[in-house]
Regions:
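Short, aromatic- and glycine-rich surface loops/edge beta-strands on solvent-exposed regions
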Residues: 92-102
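Short, hydrophobic beta-strand segments
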Residues: 61-92, 111-114
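Aromatic/hydrophobic beta-strand junction motif of beta-rich domains
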Residues: 16-24
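Short acidic/polar inter-strand loop motif in beta-rich domains
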Residues: 102-108
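A post-motif C-terminal structural segment
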Residues: 47-77, 129-130, 139-191, 200, ...
């Protein structure tokens, strides 16, 4: 590692790891490693092993003998390994890493190092001082379209307005595969953007290795780490999410691990590596990993991490009221730790609809979360803090996490509401960028990117409700409610949604007579009654017998008396069974928080990701680079080029030198 074909930015730190495995109990001997013809075998940091050879027999490094960053766990005893940390290549071109053992076995990888800094003969682009990357987790084209149809509506076939994310200057399509799968999970999905490298599913900021330790894998430098190191103390990083802050997407901007579920360990590394990751603003859920069990947390080591952040100058906040207080404060704190939930934050449907069409926050277990901030408020606070304290610029990642999490539950309304909430955060970012990009100072410009890590659920917009078959009218759900274009006479129906809206674009009634109807191609068996659910429920549950399989959850849209199948007015609407297309999994989700995760090791009763390309929209310096179809890893270099003005200006700028512009080679 890195794998063959990897493209690195000139000056970007990365680790080299070589693993030689024997078919016998004895490890291979005399492993030699060369970098572009230069022997670097002596630079192996692993401890001496079999016959005194470093790395032979699976040796790691003695804990405490080297700085924690350079530590490595033990590997299988029939392996000989090489590890060199923090390699930096500054000259562009092709680099060859070759490994050989005494028996003549040879392996070779070719890497490309790409220049990204502005050339002496500048191309005319203005540099981006600040980068704001907004990621709607799992947000494919249909998710964006659904949010527009609901929050803007149609008149005479034309949209009554655009989403904020529809208004950016340039749009392209991103290919989302991970290093080991056509269908990525969120960890390598985000990590590919932030490092320029593919990772295995479940891993972020690292390449795979043969050790069990979750934090010793070979690393690649994140964009925030890179710019912090190269721009200095005046550059800062912000991470804002509606998920647990140790969840895949937020962690894949600052923490290097092969285990996306290592919650407490991930929280530790946010703190312990703050000098290099540059994170001064961290907001979302996940308080459980910052406090011990005896203090409403889940840590088993007794560590009280949140107070440690406070001791290092972070302002620790926990409510929407706290966010509003800091937004009004002058000066605003430079360092902010916002932990607004024990796990993932309350979703927009339940925050906006509390006491009206959602009962989720009325549940006693959720009493502490009734004063939860909206994502737009968190985004505004992050921008206020970072812009005030980052003379060398900042990198800010803002995630709408529960677009994905509610898509996993095939929870149409909650997914749409979270997409609308996310779009309101996009509007906050665009307003900030308009101010910096239109003033008289050419050195403070901002690049805004809106994209997704993958598509979630195989979502399709399958129709608009035909009023004559409305569930509230019939007292039951029928498939004929999903009107597409079946007409007896040309003027018989108007098939445009009719949601009443508040002043923020959220519906005041989630179940109008003509609502949009969604279908999920990547879902297990579930019931459907075309009516929103007042509480969050699993779509499928396990039924234990000789073999454990999952079935559609009768408590969600089923026909039982205890089913959450009622309209806002209280009328029960029994649903019909929708046969799923993916495996139903062997274990039930123990609670809704776990159910809406997408951990590969857990048997699913939830919808899955798909391999569909996802849209990316950009505005600001270098935005035109993002026109076209490209790998998720290409985004990293495009951002770096934008940061120095090293890009072509205008509509011809979509094709830039690099991996995305290379011709397709015939398959051998």
């Amino acid at each position: 590692m890195p794998p063959d074909g990897a493209v690195l930015a000139a000056g970007q730190r990365f680790d080299i790891r070589v693993e030689a495995t024997s078919d016998t109990a004895e490890p291979p001997s005399k492993l030699t490693v060369t970098l572009s013809g230069k022997d670097i075998t002596s630079q192996n940091i692993l401890d001496p092993g079999t016959n005194g050879e470093r790395g032979a027999g699976g040796t790691g490094t003695v804990d405490g003998a080297l700085a924690r960053l350079f530590w490595a766990g033990t590997a299988p005893p029939n392996t000989t390994n090489f590890l060199k940390r923090q390699v930096v290549l500054t000259t562009s071109g092709t680099i060859v890493i070759e490994a050989r053992t005494a028996d003549g076995a040879t392996a070779r990888v070719r890497l490309t190092v790409e220049s990204w800094r502005a050339l002496a003969s500048a191309r005319g682009g203005r540099p981006a001082k600040n980068i704001i990357l907004l990621l709607g987790d799992g947000m494919g084209i249909a998710h964006r379209t659904a949010a527009r149809l609901v929050s803007r509506g149609l008149t005479n076939g034309k949209a009554n307005g655009r989403l904020a994310m529809d208004t950016l200057d340039a749009t392209g399509m991103v290919m989302t595969a991970s290093l080991n799968s056509a269908i990525t999970d969120s960890s390598p999905g985000m990590s590919s953007y932030a490092t320029g490298q593919k990772s295995n599913n479940n891993q972020e900021g690292v390449f795979p290795d043969n050790t069990a330790n979750a934090f010793d894998n070979p690393r690649t430098e994140y964009i925030g780490e890179f710019l912090k190191r190269t721009r200095g103390a005046g550059f800062n990083v912000g991470i804002v999410t509606t998920a647990d802050v140790t969840d895949s997407t937020p962690a894949a901007n600052a923490v290097h691990t092969s285990d996306r579920t290592a919650g407490a360990g991930i929280a530790d590394r946010f703190f312990e590596e703050r000098a290099t990751n540059g994170v001064t603003v961290l907001m979302g859920g996940g308080q459980r990993y910052f406090m011990p069990k005896e203090d409403r947390g889940e840590r088993t080591d007794g560590r009280r991490l949140a107070p440690e952040f406070e001791q290092e100058g972070y302002t620790w906040i926990a409510t929407r009221t706290d966010v509003q207080r800091l937004l009004a404060a002058s000066p605003v704190p430079k360092k902010i730790l916002g932990l607004f939930h024990q796990t993932h934050m309350a979703v927009a449907f339940d925050k906006v609809g509390a006491g009206k069409y959602s009962d989720e926050l009325a549940r006693p277990a959720n009493e502490a979360y009734r004063d939860s901030p909206m994502l737009e408020d968190m985004a505004a606070l992050a921008l206020k803090s970072l812009s005030a304290h980052s003379p060398s610029g900042f990198y800010l990642m803002i995630e709408g996490a529960s677009i994905d999490k509610r898509a996993h539950a095939a929870d149409s309304e909650r997914m749409i509401w979270d997409t609308i909430e996310f779009d309101r955060a996009v509007a906050v970012a665009l307003a900030f960028a308009r101010r910096t990009n239109s003033d008289q100072d050419p050195s403070n410009d901002t690049l805004v990117i809106v994209t997704a890590d993958h598509e979630s659920g195989g979502l399709g917009i399958i129709g608009v409700g035909n009023e004559r078959y409305a569930p509230a009218t019939l007292g039951k759900a029928v498939r004929d409610y999903a009107a597409v274009f079946r007409f007896t006479t040309p003027q018989e129906l108007t098939l445009f949604p009719n949601y009443p809206l508040d002043d923020k674009g959220f519906p005041t009634d989630p179940d109008p007579s003509r609502k949009i109807l969604l279908g999920w191609a990547g879902a297990p068996d579930h019931n459907e009654n075309w009516v929103s659910n007042r509480i969050q429920q699993e779509q499928a549950i396990a039924q234990k017998g000789e073999t454990t399989v999952s079935v559609a959850n009768p408590a969600r849209d089923g026909d039982g008396p205890d089913s959450d199948n009622k309209t806002v007015g209280g009328k029960p609407i029994p649903g019909f069974l929708v046969r799923g297309t993916i495996e139903n999994g062997e274990t039930a989700c123990p609670d809704v928080t776990v159910c809406t995760a997408d951990t590969p090791s857990v048997g699913h009763t939830i919808s899955g990701h798909t391999a569909s390309d996802v849209p990316l929209s950009a505005s600001g310096p270098g935005a035109w680079q993002f026109v076209g179809v490209y790998e998720n890893t290409d985004v990293f270099l495009k951002i770096l080029r934008a940061s120095t003005g090293n890009y072509r200006v205008g509509s011809d700028a979509g094709l830039t030198p690099g991996a995305s512009a290379r011709p397709v080679q015939p398959r051998k």
